[in-house]
Amino acid sequence: MSELWFGLNVSPSAAPGTDPVADARRAEELGYDFVSVNDHLHGTAPRHETWTLLTWIAAATSRIRVVPRVLAVPYRNPAVVAKMAETLDRLSGGRLVLGLGGGYADEEFRAFGLPARTPRDKVDGMEEAIRIARGVWSEPEFSFQGRLYRTEEARVEPKPAHRIPIWLGTYGDRALGVTGRLADG
């Protein structure tokens, strides 16, 4: 039987008077299992970058898990994300859940000079990212040739101390199939 976790989405707002780290500390005090931070490059108000904010939250808390909700795969190279995840998980004492998604805000792709992704690209990219992450986390060297991403004898060292859970933010039959086959939630 699966465990049921309760979490709180912490706003990544950088507007004056906001304090996402204080919000995360309060969630921990209240007994929440995780805090999540959404991943958008810009919005209607000033915002912190997700990965940096999660690192800050992990350093300021001691028990609560941290989750990018969800890290848009097309914004970052999956092998680099796997290394970032291993590092944050290790430094936080094993509290990372890696949330991944295909990215849906096409205006963010354009605004930041990222190549546009079709729905097929977004689903394929999530699947390839999971295969790459799990490969570099478990193999001494990992080579992968996908439709969108590749690695050549990539190494992530040290290896994760435990299996890092991967959650996907998806919709649509094909993406839900990837969730069922490869993800932990």
Features from the language model and the residues they span:
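Active-site nucleophile and cofactor-binding loops and adjacent substrate-binding regions
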Residues: 44, 68-76
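Alpha-helix-loop-beta-strand connector modules within alpha/beta enzyme cores
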Residues: 47-69, 125-132
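Internal, glycine-rich beta/alpha segment that forms the wall or movable "lid"
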Residues: 2, 77-182
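Acidic (Asp/Glu)-rich catalytic clusters
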Residues: 25-29, 54-63, 85, 89-96, ...
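Feature marks short, surface-exposed loop/turn motifs that line or immediately flank catalytic pockets
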Residues: 14, 41, 74, 104-106
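Hydrophobic faces of well-ordered beta-strands that scaffold small-molecule active sites
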Residues: 4-10, 35-37, 65-69, 96-100, ...
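N-terminal beta1-alpha1-beta2 module of alpha/beta enzyme domains
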Residues: 1-61, 164
